[in-house]
Each structure stands twice: as structure tokens, then as C-alpha cells.
Amino acid sequence: MRKLKILVVYANHGGCSYYRQLSPMKMMQEMLPDKVEVRYTDNPLEINPEKNEAPPPDKLKDMNWADIVFVANILKFGGPYTARVIGMGKELGKFVHFDTDDLLTGLYEEHHLYDTYKDNKLDEITKFCYYNADLVTVTQMKFAHRIKPYIRKCMAVIKNVIDYSLPAWNHPKTKAKFTRVGYAAGIHHRGDVKVFNAIPHLVNQKVGRENVQWNFYGHPPPDPSKKGTWEAQVWPEYMSHLLRGFKGGKNYNIHYALPP
């Protein structure tokens, strides 16, 4: 029996792509090696940005190879490119799967990329992707209900994959007076951070700052090459919101995220 050929078209190697595409497809191929073959690309149209050239549709190696074209979010070459991948997949007779874990239509103003989406009409491009895809997958039911009017064929709710290959030690209970609490929020969502910054102030006040130690992880090391970009600007803004909750003496640490 011929293997099912899946072309994974990813935007980057960040959390959105990793937990929605890269990790689950890798797991699927490991579990079903005799039934599934997976390829990965971030440029299925094979464009040459420097020359602004691309092969004709019948010469696109990966697109013609695939049975399923699996696209997630807006790709790195922009909204029109993403829409073209969806359209090209349909033109070539492929089953097109579009996944998103962020509400790209009717984006709220506190989203860090609100102006980018508005100025580039990415909400309209996303509606095109929803309408033309054979399958649209999202992260939760509330999300699904909000975009239902734009879906022409099939939609499913799929939670983020759990990466079982990551270490998951069962730490022994400590007798120390500290209680460890984990918090995770995306840097694109100012609203999350603005809500959270009241919590450190409240906890420090209730139990005493001498009994609490806060540790924040994920801040990338300074990168001079990204000076002036949104990536360089978002972290100082993120931390300024977050640290407003700390009044008085410092009882927190900020840890840079170092590559493995």
C-alpha cells in the first residue's frame, strides 16, 4: 500500500509551529512509518526572494509530491504568499489543511501584532484560507464558534500536542517553605501580562516578600542584529508590564533562554 504523503508548511520553529505541526507530525511518522511519509518546508512555492522568481506550478517539487498540504498560520513570506500556497494546493488537487492557534480575524487591539494584521489586511487573507481549506483546525471550541461563518468545508478542534520526549521528572516534595507556581503567557498578548502583574503584588503583600521568590524564564539573550525590530522591542515592553507588580525590594530573577 502506498504511503500517505504529507507536506508540512511551517512559518518558523517557534511554539506555534512546534506544538501544532513539527512535533505531532514527527510523532506520527515515528508511529506509522509504513503508512505515512512527511516532508517539511517553509517555502513550498520555491520563490527566490532576491530575484523574485519561482518555478511554474508543475515544477514545484514538494507541492506536486504531496497528497496533503498542511499549512499553519501566516507564513514567513507574508499573507499573500500564504493564500497562494492554499490556492496552489487546491489547483494541484491536494487536500489542504489549514491550522491556527491564534484568532486572526477580529483581532483584539491589545495583541502585539494588531497594527500589522490591520495594515496588511491579514484578517481578510485568513478568511480566504478558512474558506478554501478542506480542513481547518483550531485549539478550542470558543475559537471554533467565532470563525464558523468563514468555514466552507470541515473544522475540528485539536489541542496542542504533548511532547513525550521532553524530560518529565517527578520531583520529590520539598520541605522548604517555598511553593513553586508556574505561569505561561505569550509575548503577543499584552492583556495576559497586564492581568498577571497584579498577582506578584498581591502575593508578596499577603505572605511577605521574604517568603516568595519569583523566577521568569524565556527572555532571549540580547541580539544586536535584531535592534529596532519588533522582536527586540517586545521583550522590554513585556517585562515592564510584568514587573509593575513588584513594589519594594527585588525578590525575582529573570533568566535568559539559552539554546540547547
Q: What are these model-derived regions, one by one?
A:
Residues M1-K76:
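N-terminal pre-catalytic "stem/leader" segment of glycosyltransferase-like enzymes
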Residues N12-M27, D163-W169, K173-P259:
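Conserved catalytic-core segment of nucleotide-activated headgroup transferases in glycan assembly
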Residues A54-D58, N64, V85-E91, L104, ...:
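Membrane-proximal helix-turn-helix segments that form the acceptor-binding/catalytic region
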Residues V69-F70, H97, Y131-M141:
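A short beta-strand/loop micro-motif in the catalytic core of glycosyltransferases
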Residues A72-E91, T105, V193-F196:
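An aromatic- and histidine-rich active-site surface loop
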Residues E91-F95, A133, R152-C154:
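A short helix->loop->beta-strand "cap" motif at the edges of active sites that frequently abuts
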Residues H97-T126, K177, K227-W230, M239, ...:
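Acceptor-binding helix/loop patch of EC 2.4 sugar-transfer enzymes
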Residues K142, V161:
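Carbohydrate-associated surface elements
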